[in-house]
Curated annotation (Swiss-Prot):
Family stated for the protein in its record: Belongs to the bacterial ribosomal protein bL9 family.
Keyword Ribonucleoprotein carried by entry: yes
HAMAP family: Ribosomal_bL9
The organism of origin for this protein: Rickettsia felis (strain ATCC VR-1525 / URRWXCal2)
Annotated GO biological process: translation
Protein name, per record: Large ribosomal subunit protein bL9
Task of the protein: Binds to the 23S rRNA.
Signal peptide annotation: none
Superkingdom per UniProt: Bacteria
A GO CC term attached to the entry: ribonucleoprotein complex
Origin organism lineage: Bacteria, Pseudomonadati, Pseudomonadota, Alphaproteobacteria, Rickettsiales
Keywords, sorted A to Z: Ribonucleoprotein, Ribosomal protein, RNA-binding, rRNA-binding
Molecular function in Gene Ontology: rRNA binding; structural constituent of ribosome
Gene3D superfamilies referenced in this protein's UniProt entry, alphabetically: Ribosomal protein L9, C-terminal domain, Ribosomal protein L9, N-terminal domain
Length: 171
């Protein structure tokens, strides 16, 4: 299936790119999400005319996202959970919980589908989590999972000493 992107799509292309994609990917994802349109002759002409409008709209969205990124950047989210003796959680910290807490902290709604977890969070500790804000912009937040507030503060102190040691080594 040939499509024309009307929004930037990570690892696929930018606005106005004409691509050949698998039929299922186009029909089930790109078209319903309004990320692309079919590459018919009328649509090709339309895109040529409206490409500047799409790019201006994308630029405006990117500027808004950069403001949100400034708020999110360097956030530390603390989750207090019950654990077994070896530090394993009864359950896990999900991307939805991270999105809810982050949305609460920055007063901006972050979709849980934008939270990228490398692996499930099932143990106490410090985790780095990536938030996809835009096709070209990601933010990084620190998630701290602990049994108590005092343990969370200990993790924060450890992280500060590690960062100051890293800075001293690089100097």
């Amino acid at each position: 299936m040939e499509i024309i992107l009307i929004k930037p799509v990570r690892k696929l292309g930018k606005i106005g790119d004409m691509l050949k994609v698998a039929d299922g990917f186009g029909r089930n994802y790109l078209l319903p999400q309004k990320l692309a349109i079919r590459a018919t002759e009328p649509n090709k002409e339309l895109i040529v005319k409206q490409k500047h409008e799409f790019e201006a709209k994308d630029k405006q969205i990117r500027e808004e996202v950069e403001k949100i990124n400034a708020l999110i950047k360097d956030q530390k989210l603390v989750f207090i959970r019950q654990t077994s003796d070896d530090g394993k959680l009864f359950g896990s910290v999900t991307n939805k919980e991270i999105a809810d807490k982050l949305s609460e902290n920055v007063s901006y709604n972050i979709a849980h589908s934008n939270i990228i977890l490398d692996k499930q969070i099932k143990f106490t500790g410090i985790y780095t989590v990536e938030i996809r804000l835009h096709a070209e912009l990601n933010a990084i937040v620190t998630v701290i999972v602990a049994r108590s507030e005092s343990e969370a503060q200990d993790y924060l102190r450890e992280q500060k000493t590690e960062t100051s040691e890293d800075l001293a080594e690089s100097a």
